């Protein structure tokens, strides 16, 4: 599994960036930490609709019920957004993912204010897809 920061550390690192260019570079760097997605997972079933870029997300429960998240995108900034989302959900069960509202975290970063409308819609589509996958396991 990718080495992603815990949400609190992610927020601290984000706050240390001097401007939005640095924040974007940090998000892109987080995306580079994601494990490669196997080609067989790049299929229509795992493709997230509602994203301008191609985004694939795969969820797999482990033996303790924790959801393991895998994802990729053909756009560097979107791949970074996937990593940010995964850092919020890492280590959680399907029930915890369904119950967790991550929107306040994104609001605290003011990220949506600096994303294009299509990127914001794509981010929402990713969140909905992960929650739907988690809910289907309950």
UniProtKB/Swiss-Prot annotation:
HAMAP family: SufE
UniProt keyword list: Cytoplasm
Similarity field: Belongs to the SufE family.
Annotated localization: Cytoplasm
Pfam (any one): SufE
Superkingdom per UniProt: Bacteria
Assembly behavior: Homodimer. Interacts with SufS.
GO BP, one annotated term: sulfur compound metabolic process
InterPro entries from the UniProt entry: Cysteine_desulfuration_SufE, Fe-S_metab-assoc_dom
Protein name: Cysteine desulfuration protein SufE
Organism, as annotated: Pectobacterium atrosepticum (strain SCRI 1043 / ATCC BAA-672)
Known role: Participates in cysteine desulfuration mediated by SufS. Cysteine desulfuration mobilizes sulfur from L-cysteine to yield L-alanine and constitutes an essential step in sulfur metabolism for biosynthesis of a variety of sulfur-containing biomolecules. Functions as a sulfur acceptor for SufS, by mediating the direct transfer of the sulfur atom from the S-sulfanylcysteine of SufS, an intermediate product of cysteine desulfuration process.
């Amino acid at each position: 599994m990718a080495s992603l920061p815990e949400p609190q550390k992610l927020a601290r690192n984000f706050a240390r960036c001097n401007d939005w260019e640095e924040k974007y570079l940090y998000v892109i760097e987080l995306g580079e930490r994601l494990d490669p997605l196997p080609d067989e997972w790049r299929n229509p079933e795992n493709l997230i609709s509602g994203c301008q870029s191609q985004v694939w997300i795969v969820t797999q429960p482990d033996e303790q019920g924790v959801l393991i998240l895998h994802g990729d995108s053909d756009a560097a900034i979107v791949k970074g957004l996937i990593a940010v989302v995964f850092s919020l959900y890492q280590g959680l069960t399907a029930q915890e993912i369904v119950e967790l509202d991550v929107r306040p975290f994104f609001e605290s970063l003011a990220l949506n204010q600096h994303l294009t409308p299509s990127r914001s819609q794509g981010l929402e589509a990713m969140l909905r897809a992960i929650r739907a996958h988690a809910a289907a396991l309950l």
